[in-house]
Amino acid sequence: MANAMFEVASGWGLRVDRGPNWLLVRVRSNHDGPPDNEPLAERLWHLMEEHFVYRLVLELDEVEVLDDLVIRQLERLDHVARDHGGFLRLCGLSRHNWQRVVRNGLGDVFYPYGDRKEAVFTFHPPHELRKEA
């Protein structure tokens, strides 16, 4: 897996690794500098387009608080990725951040993978498919 870069977007530190057909992005809150005007999800989408990869794993274990605006951005990013045959997986979420995702009504959209390996190699069907099974 190639180590691609470390960037800052919208007050977030992004460490990007590229694997076969995957982008793995470690996200951390960056309070050292002023945020730019580009939303986190938009920067992530640009990375996906730049690498022609629409499967994205976000490692969120270094994010203290995932706010509602960012959660909604990630929901939209998941929709766009799916429109391109990909998807977004979240891993390393704290219990508090996972509860925030659920409170935003997205517990059926995302699954709380433990780490990047689980996110890449384990399949958890969307909630709608789990109901039908």
Sequence positions of predicted segments:
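STAS-typified acidic loop motif
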Residues: 2-43, 60
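Intrinsically disordered, low-complexity segments enriched in polar/charged residues with Gly/Pro
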Residues: 1-4, 99-101
